[in-house]
């Protein structure tokens, strides 16, 4: 029993001595690598560096993070990006044209023909208005060509139409004072009738002053009679 105890004690002393030796060697190695590697990081153990100490607080006690810089001109160094043309336009141009079926084309032509027929034509000629319903546009063109060339137009009807047209306004101006003349003649006739009705009274009035004038001169006759009587 005593031998086993001494054996275990000697083994423990050896282990402690070997552990102390390894610790001393490690500390010596770290001191040597302190200047270049920086402690345990140079051993390749995957240890992260210790965080940097925070800067000292300002006078107010508020923490101020270190300033950061941003490179705003980094896009100038990047190569230019080539923009591809719009593929939708090219695809639309490359698509083949789809034609409508024959039945649909015939229906469209029929509808167009019906639209041409459902038109109204109004003609002003010879002071009259003539209206044609459902007159096709193709015949309108033919009619305009005929009118422009003068074919199919009777000269007698043209002259009759021009003769039947009303006179212009400047020719009818002298006819306007006729009513005034008639009213003036009526007024003069009425005035003449009044003068004829008042004519006897005017004659008596003119005779009365002559009588008064003769009466005023009658004393001259009395003087002549007195001289004649004295002579007798």
UniProtKB/Swiss-Prot annotation:
Tell me the InterPro entries matching this sequence: CCT_CS, TIFY/JAZ, Tify_dom
Q: Which domain of life is it from?
A: Eukaryota
Region labeled Disordered — which residues? 54-73, 151-176
Residue ranges spanning the membrane: these are none
Q: Which SMART domains match?
A: TIFY
**GO annotation, biological process:** defense response; regulation of defense response; regulation of jasmonic acid mediated signaling pathway; response to wounding
The Tify domain is annotated at 114-149
Q: How is it modified after translation?
A: Ubiquitinated. Increase in jasmonoyl isoleucine (JA-Ile) levels mediates its degradation via COI1B-mediated proteasome pathway.
Leader sequence segment? none
What GO cellular-component annotations does this UniProt entry give? Answer: cytosol; nucleus
Q: What is its main location?
A: nucleus
Q: Where is this motif: Jas?
A: 177-202
Which stretch carries the motif Nuclear localization signal?
A: 179-186
**Know anything about its domains from the record?**
The jas domain (177-202) is required for interaction with COI1.
Q: Report quaternary structure and partners.
A: Interacts with BHLH148. Interacts with COI1B in a coronatine-dependent manner. Coronatine is an analog of jasmonoyl isoleucine (JA-Ile). Interacts with TIFY5/JAZ2, TIFY6B/JAZ4, TIFY9/JAZ5, TIFY11A, TIFY11D/JAZ12 and TIFY11G/JAZ15.
Q: What does this protein do?
A: Repressor of jasmonate (JA) responses. Acts as a repressor of JA-induced resistance to the bacterial blight pathogen Xanthomonas oryzae pv. oryzae (Xoo). Regulates JA-induced accumulation of linalool at the transcriptional level of linalool synthase gene LIS. Linalool is important for resistance to bacterial blight pathogen Xoo.
Q: Identify this protein by name.
A: Protein TIFY 10c
